Amino acid sequence: MKRTNHAFLWMTLLCLVLAGCAARSADPPAESSSPAPVVEEGASGPADFESSAIVEDVSIDSGRGYAIPSTITLPASGQDWPLVVLCHGFTGNRNGDGHFPRVARELADRGIACVAPDFAGNGESALPFTDYTLSGMYDDLESVIAYMRTAYPVSSETLGLVGHSMGGRVATLHLDERVTAVALWSPANNTGSDGFEFLSHTAEGREELLQRARTEGQVEVPSWGVTVSKTFLEEMDESDPCARLEAYDGPVLLAFAAGDSEVLSDDTVALVTRTLRSRDRSFVDMTGDFPEATHNYTALPDSGSSDAAVCRRIESAPVGFLADALLTDADSH
């Protein structure tokens, strides 16, 4: 019996020692003054760089009874950062087809804060898609800008916008003297109802959608798997983003891709480029730089290119452009 008791005691002691070691190994590491590097993965797969950026998912109060799910990306140090807002397209989300996280982290590494919201009915938004409207997105941009300037040491003077497709239209309609620079990827910037040509490629089809929405309050768009509201279509019909673009005096980067033809007309490309060329100042014109890219800036099938190559080019372009525009502007204040 004594041997049995001794064995039992030894086994008990051994278990206690092992448990203590396991508990110590599970303790979280002490906080460091420098955040751990982030290895970015985007549309092109694992990236070839590490970032010191701080990335957080937050829920921003719109002030209108709902939350705006957003991702913020901050520099690891400093203050009075310029701010960039990244605007996704129709039925998209704040990941921006995989492009926005890398753009945001590269900008943060250069000292620029970024925020990417999910617009109503998109991504993690709790709202129905029928709440997706131009006026709602304008208000959401105002809310996220105000939040960033209140919650973080963000400059009140220096603001950049990036917009893809419908996000490009939203960014363009937001242009005024407060916006330092804007980067537009394949903006859906045709005038009036031609602006929702991605819902119907014919004028007759667009008019039918508008009239049905006016009669029923909303209209289903089976090709996109969503129902849009009368408000959305009427606001599109009444808006003229190129008039706002023509009046804007700040730096602009513009890109279009060969694959845009599935969503946007040649008339849209011509109108936007003609508008920018009519201004008194030059712009970064990348309209012919993506013959191998889809509307979402991945490689077209049989193009001989790769998603990684297209992604690197479309993602790096606004980083250099916005860093030059925003950091120079920040230094002047």
Regions found by a protein language model. Name each.
Residues 104-126:
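Conserved alpha/beta-hydrolase
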Residues 131-152:
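Alpha/beta-hydrolase active-site loop
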Residues 162-173:
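Glycine-rich nucleophile elbow surrounding the catalytic serine of serine-hydrolase chemistry
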Residues 92-104, 119, 266-267:
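The serine-hydrolase catalytic nucleophile loop
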Residues 37-78:
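N-terminal cap/lid segment of alpha/beta-hydrolase-fold proteins
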